[in-house]
Amino acid sequence: MQAERPLWVPDREIVERSPMAEFIDWCGERFGRSFADYDAFHDWSVSERGAFWTAVWEHCKVIGESGEKALVDGDRMLDARFFPEARLNFAENLLRKTGSGDALIFRGEDKVSYRLTWDELRALVSRLQQALRAQGIGAGDRVAAMMPNMPETIALMLATASVGAIWSSCSPDFGEQGVLDRFGQIAPKLFIVCDGYWYNGKRQDVDSKVRAVAKSLGAPTVIVPYAGDSAALAPTVEGGVTLADFIAGFQAGPLVFERLPFGHPLYILFSSGTTGVPKCIVHSAGGTLLQHLKEHRFHCGLRDGERLFYFTTCGWMMWNWLASGLAVGATLCLYDGSPFCPDGNVLFDYAAAERFAVFGTSAKYIDAVRKGGFTPARTHDLSSLRLMTSTGSPLSPEGFSFVYEGIKPDVQLASISGGTDIVSCFVLGNPLKPVWRGEIQGPGLGLAVDVWNDEGKPVRGEKGELVCTRAFPSMPVMFWNDPDGAKYRAAYFDRFDNVWCHGDFAEWTPHGGIVIHGRSDATLNPGGVRIGTAEIYNQVEQMDEVAEALCIGQDWEDDVRVVLFVRLARGVELTEALTREIKNRIRSGASPRHVPAKIIAVADIPRTKSGKIVELAVRDVVHGRPVKNKEALANPEALDLFAGLEELKS
């Protein structure tokens, strides 16, 4: 039997020239330490968190005053405070660069394309921050945006942060109730919208939704031109004004930044909302900045002038992560719309034309490219691409292989995982270590990540809960409208005392990497054996006949049985032969325990706005329980397909 080999191994020159290696050497000199290897450095970053995060601040040249203390009450997760004396402004650190080089490059499908230089971006932010101040918006006020992933959105966020206000955003494909479920909780002082957007080659109208949401929020509304007629829409919206009129009275001048405490709120992000009204998760300016600087500069190796792309909407935390790339001087490549319009080459066309250094996307996208028969390795010049990242759901081992066979054989592939809760990653890529098929390379610097069993003991070689045992800067400041912190504590600290339990079912590998087997709350438990749903998806979704799958545990005869729903490829029927083939694939690729008791074909599978399937909502429908918040779904009508199924009555 041939020994397993890594898919990618960094060559010596890459290692020696990487910002990660440079940082390790710098820390050794700065603190008089010698680190034998990366693992030793990671251990130090966790045991000496004050020194480590001070090093990130100093090495990345954060603009602001750090104060004398880096960490207070570090042993208590909920009470820990990083840089309690610090003063800084998030936007000031993202707008340190000037000149005629590209800051933002944008494509809206094949309908719109333009770019902003650093000087143009700074000029726009200057006019916007003056307009915000004239509107009476300052520290602690909320600005809510229902916007595409376009340059104006980045500029508006930066202007909001520059005056100390709090930014919150969603994508324009949210329904009226979905927008209100989010922004209605935070009482924004200003509402920002587009006048339409493009998706799949068609203009999507938002006029009636904008009018209804603006009226309900009762806030002045700024309408940004994109795919409609903002001048015609503005007079029909209560408190409506076009972006041009909003900034008309202000000329670009020197930028003015409000320096505030490290823990001052920067963003309000939202949970998916599939189990109730979305939680409003508040993230700090300092914690977000330091964590993203660490991830971009060291884990991704981003350098000044390189081009960073992430396929995301403004309703997903990866948009916030992408925006922070400006802090290392990277050029952001923005895209809005369908990643398959006009065809599946569109993002690779973009990557080749603009010479992406980092291409970020989702596991679902990689699988769709593979199933679509696209092979960019043969059709595109991706010579500039050195790092590809994948998140949103676990990337299957076959997905790993496809990246190296079909996209680029010498790229570093970093599967990453974290979430809205920390606006960053717990586990991610590492330019100093090999990439192994199906594995995330390892934990982030400064993060005490581990896998624990139900008894709260660390485990190796078996699955358990992904935890973080020590405080870190990008923990939420609080949940909005949670004055006693009860919702916050229940979300992360109910399971283990003084330990963050993230809700992922995970496993360490012999290489020191991590495999995420799915969400803990969606874990299947037939016969008392815990099975991660991703273990089943990894087998089934590699089959050309299966477009998508969703798995639940159904309560049955005092036990739980595994039920697999499949959305089949066009023209395919679920015959007895295909059912046997699916079961055999699961049995041989996973184990006999993973084989579903029932396999049922459905026309569609419900998913969130960011493309994640919703196992818990389907499980509720199957068991006759109400789904609390269908507005959180991109296709809520799909839930009806799972109600009262005859196949599940026997």
Swiss-Prot record:
Its EC number is 6.2.1.16. Disruption phenotype: Acetyl-CoA synthetase activity is not affected in mutant cells, whereas acetoacetyl-CoA synthetase activity is drastically reduced. Moreover, after growth in YM medium, cells lacking this gene accumulate PHB to 60 to 70% of cell dry mass. They display reduced ability to proliferate during the first 30 days of incubation in growth medium lacking nutrient carbon. Pfam families: AMP-binding, AMP-binding_C. InterPro entries: Acac_CoA_synth, AMP-bd_C, AMP-bd_C_sf, AMP-binding_CS, AMP-dep_synth/lig_dom, ANL_N_sf. Mg(2+) binds at V546. One of its GO terms (biological process) is lipid metabolic process. GO terms for molecular function: acetoacetate-CoA ligase activity; ATP binding; metal ion binding. The modification N6-acetyllysine is found at K612. Keywords: Acetylation, ATP-binding, Ligase, Magnesium, Metal-binding, Nucleotide-binding. Acetylated. Deacetylation by the SIR2-homolog deacetylase activates the enzyme. CoA binds at Y199, N200, G201, K202, R587. ATP binds at G392, S393, P394, D504, R519, R530. Belongs to the ATP-dependent AMP-binding enzyme family. This is Acetoacetyl-coenzyme A synthetase. It comes from Rhizobium meliloti (strain 1021). The gene is acsA2.
